[in-house]
Structures are given as C-alpha cells and as structure tokens.
Amino acid sequence: AAVPTAKPATSKDIQGATQTGTPTFEGATVQVNGQDKAITIKDNSYTLLDKDGNEVATTPAYAEDGTTEIGTYSIDPATGQVTFTPTDKSYTGKVTPVKVQAESSNGIKVDTTYTPEIVPVTPTATPAETTDIQGATQTGKPEFKGGTVTVDGVEKTVEINDDVPATFDDGSTTKTVDGVGTYTVAADGTVTFTPEKSFTGKAPAVTVVREDKNGTKASATYTPTVT
C-alpha cells in the first residue's frame, strides 16, 4: 500500500506569545497495472489527536511534565496549521508535543507531532536615589523596562503592564517609618517621600515592584537622602 509521509513541526517564541506550526504531510505514488497513480492527502482531513487518541479540533496543551495544563492547541483542518495559545503566561520551556493526523485519499491515516518552545523573558529595573534639604518632599522613580530576548535572530520584548499599578514589595502603596517620614508609590512607580521635619541623613530604601504583560515581576529600590 502507498503510505503517505509525515514530518513534525516545531516553533519557538517568547513567553506569552501565540505560536503556530504546520507539520508536513506528503502523498505517495503507487503503480497500478503499470500506471503511476498519485495518492494525495484528503482535503480537510487534518486533525489533532487528544491524549486518548480521539480526533479533535482543539485539545489542552500541557507543560513538559505532561499533566499541567498551560494552554490550548487548535488546528485548521484545511491547511494543517496548528496554533498554540498559552493560558498560563508564567510557563516557560518545552511544551508537551501534540499529535497531528492527516488521511490519504486511499484511507490511510498517518500522524506526527507539533512542539512549541517558550523562551523566558524577564523585565529589568534600575534603582533611583534623590537628595534634598531638610523638610523638603522628594520624589524618585525607579526605571522599569520590558525584557527583551532574541528568538531566531529577531528581537522581541514583553512590555511593562501599565494597567497594573506599582506597589511596594509587601503589596502596600504607603509606608511610614517612625522618626523618618512617609513614602507613597503612585501607579506609575513614582515614589513620594515626605520626611519628618527633624529628620536628616540617608533614609531607608523602599522596594518598588512592577510586572510585565505576562505577570513576571521586577523590583528596584528608591533611596532618599535629606541634607
């Protein structure tokens, strides 16, 4: 019998990104009564196989451990293109492959795999310091930047999520240190320090936390000095 061939597909992209891959299925040629006869891949026969081997259009995607659900796979039955959509955007690394199947015009089903890989991205943060005279209110803003990695020669960035307000490292937005002063952090990460009138010297640092659009956090300190 003429058996079609199947070659797996892989893809790699940054944390949080939707990925696609299209395994290659090819028909075969068989001789019938001295004549070459083409065996083709049947139209709209592309399908996924779930964990139990059932033909499905969508199926959960699992982490490398094979049990933790981290996204979904779906397939275009006309083209065989598989889409991986992450739902747990904190996960990075290899994803358990999904089985992809097609059927030949002579009714033979063959399958192969599609395997996405997720490259981790971590935001960066730079501390801030300010100095002012006794009694003066000071403001400082640690700098947060989305992490950037290069995937297959292309630079990709996960931006800081401006919809999630900055906080201090304990989740609060206001801190008071007796005998020193009060710190408040704004949504954009700007810290306002209001010193006690009698305080001079270097005040304790406070840690500001922000996160990117995958929920990956970064932190940096702000340190005011009163002269």
Provide a role label for each language-model segment.
Residues 1-38, 97-156, 205, 213-227:
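Extracellular interdomain linkers/hinges and stalk-like, low-complexity segments
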Residues 25-26, 46-48, 104, 144, ...:
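Aromatic-residue detector
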Residues 15, 48-49, 81, 134:
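Generic detector of leucine side chains in alpha-helical contexts
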Residues 28, 51-52, 94, 121, ...:
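Low-complexity, intrinsically disordered/propeptide-like segments
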Residues 4-6, 44-48, 70-75, 123-125, ...:
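Generic structural motif
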Residues 40-42, 76, 109, 119, ...:
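Residues marking helix boundaries in flexible regions
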Residues 58-59, 64-112, 173-220:
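Acidic, turn/loop-rich segments in luminal/extracellular domains of secretory-pathway
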